[in-house]
Amino acid sequence: CFLIMAIGCVVLLRHTNIINKFNWLFFLSLGMATSYFDFLTYPLVTLGIPLILYLQLETSSPSQRFFQITTCSLSWGIGYIGFWAEKWLLGSVILQENLFSEAYNSIILRSSHETLGQTITYMATLKNNLQAYDLRTWKILWLLLFLVTIVLALHRHCLTLHNILAFSPLCLVACMPFVWYYFTQNHSYIHFGFTHRELSITFFALSCFLVQLCNSSHIEPKQKI
C-alpha cells in the first residue's frame, strides 16, 4: 500500500494538469492497483493521502472540493471493489467453483462485530488502533503543533469562520479512517498492527488543515462556500 500511495503521489505531482482533467481515472487506477497488490492491510491510504495532496494542489471552492472528494472516492471504490469482483469471477471460471459465496462469507466475517465468540465494540476497535500512537512524544508534538498554529492564526488574523469553512473538506477526508473502522470492525480489531496506519490519513489531513489555516491570507472573502 505504501508503494502504491507513494507512486500515486509522485505521478500526481509530475502530471498535475493531466490528472486535473482525468481525476476519476487516476483514482480508479489507484483503487484497481490496490485491489491487485494489497492483501487487505491498510488499503485506504492509497485513496486518502493522494486525495489530500490533490486537494492541496487545487484552487477550487469548498463546495467544488466536496464534489471532488465524492467523485474521487467513488472512482477509487469502484476500482477497488470492481477489481476484487473480477478476480472472483475469473477464479470461479477457472476453478469451476462459486467463489462469490466464499467472498460474501468473508466480507460478512470481516465486517462483523464478533471475534472468537466475543462481541466487538466500535470503541474497542478504535482503542486498538489508537494505542500505537499512545506515546508521550506524539502527544507533545501534536499539542505543540496545535498551539503554534492557533498563535500564528490569531497573530495573522486568519482564525475566522470563513477560513475554517474554506478548508473544511480536509476535515472530511480526516474522518475516512474512522468510517472504515466502523464498517470493518472485525478486521480492524484483529489486525490493528496494519490498520492503525490508516490513521496517517487523519494526521496528514489535519496537519494540512492547520498549515493552510495559518497561510490563508490569500483567500478572497467573496469566495463561495
Q: What role is predicted for each listed range?
A:
Residues C1-I7, L25, L40-L47, R197-L206:
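Membrane-embedded alpha-helical segments of multi-pass membrane proteins
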Residues F2-N17, F27-G31, I49-L57:
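Specific aromatic-rich, kink-prone transmembrane helix
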Residues L13-F22, L55-F67, H155-L161, L210-I225:
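Membrane-interface junctions at the ends of membrane-embedded or membrane-associated helices
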Residues W24-V45, P50, I69-G82:
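Membrane-interface alpha helices of multi-pass inner-membrane proteins
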Residues I69-T149:
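Membrane-lumen/periplasm interface segments of specific transmembrane helices
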Residues A85-V93, L154-C158, V179-H191:
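Juxtamembrane "helix-exit" motif on the non-cytosolic side of transmembrane helices
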Residues I150-A174:
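Membrane-interface helix-loop-helix junctions at transmembrane boundaries of multi-pass membrane enzymes
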Residues I190-C214:
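Hydrophobic/aromatic-rich transmembrane helices and adjacent perimembrane loops
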